[in-house]
Design a protein with these regions (language model features):
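Sec-dependent bacterial lipoprotein signal peptides
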Residues: 1-21
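Extended amphipathic alpha-helical heptad-repeat regions
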Residues: 30-236, 240
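Bacterial Sec signal peptide processing site at the extreme N-terminus
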Residues: 15-37
Length: 240
């Protein structure tokens, strides 16, 4: 029986490639005729441009979130190295006590320190796994945000053509409205697919976060303060 590959194990770049073939170059409308439109006739174009600006702002935020996720993962990898060093030190100290025929009370404390160090390693591993998934989520969110910008560009061109045609501007006659409408539809479909992929990845990250928290609660009293806060995988809302 063929095993299915979990979605979270697929790099975000591969997920993006699986979604159609990427954005096509935006179709441009000869908008020289827009100068003939009055304020009311230009309103749909202005509205589309405002939405495009919001999409571009959302893409900037998504890129910043991706950088934050990468930074948290880098810190987590360092914490794992520290936890490994602590375990090695605890094991060495316990071995030394055994060679010195130390008192049972000292050996018991050494055993407890070894177990605590092992718990810290398990917690560090689960934290790293969670943050690796959150990097994938951030990459998927960035891909979806970029697709939203592509959709916004297509809608701006569509609004220009419709506004000029409604005003009987000659420049509108040379444009292919069918191609522009098709470009909008393709952009919207691709954006929806990328948003679904991001949501699926986030669902996997929630499970990883919960597992990490269950282990981390046992070692939290021994752990040092977090050098960088690690938030839960809250769902991001699509830009409006």
């Amino acid at each position: 029986m063929r095993m299915r590959t979990p979605l979270w194990s697929i790099p975000a770049c591969a997920l993006a490639l699986s979604c159609a073939s990427g954005p096509k170059p935006a179709l441009k409308v000869d908008d020289s005729g827009l100068s003939r439109l009055d304020e009311t006739q230009m309103q749909p174009v202005d509205d589309a441009r405002i939405e495009l600006g919001r999409a571009q702002d959302a893409l900037s935020r998504a890129r910043a979130n991706e950088a934050d996720a990468q930074a948290r993962l880098t810190v987590a990898k360092t914490e794992r190295e520290v936890a490994d060093a602590q375990l090695k030190r605890a094991l060495a100290e316990r071995d030394l006590l055994k060679k010195q025929y130390a008192a049972q009370e000292q050996l018991t404390r050494a055993d407890e320190e070894v177990r605590a160090a092992q718990d810290r390693i398990r917690a560090a591993d689960m934290k790293r796994q969670y943050l690796e998934r959150m990097v994938q989520v951030a990459q998927a969110d960035r891909n979806a945000a970029a697709a939203h910008v592509d959709t916004g560009n297509a809608l701006v061109e569509q609004s220009k053509l419709r506004a000029m045609r409604a005003a009987d501007v000659p420049q509108a006659e040379s444009a292919n409205s069918g191609a522009i409408d098709s470009r909008v539809a393709e952009s919207q479909v691709r954006e929806a697919q990328l948003r679904k992929q991001a949501a699926d990845l986030r669902a996997g990250a929630v499970d990883a976060y919960n597992k990490w928290q269950q282990v981390d609660v046992r070692v939290r009293t021994l752990a040092r303060p977090e050098p960088m806060p690690v938030p839960p995988p809250n769902e991001t809302q699509p830009p409006r």
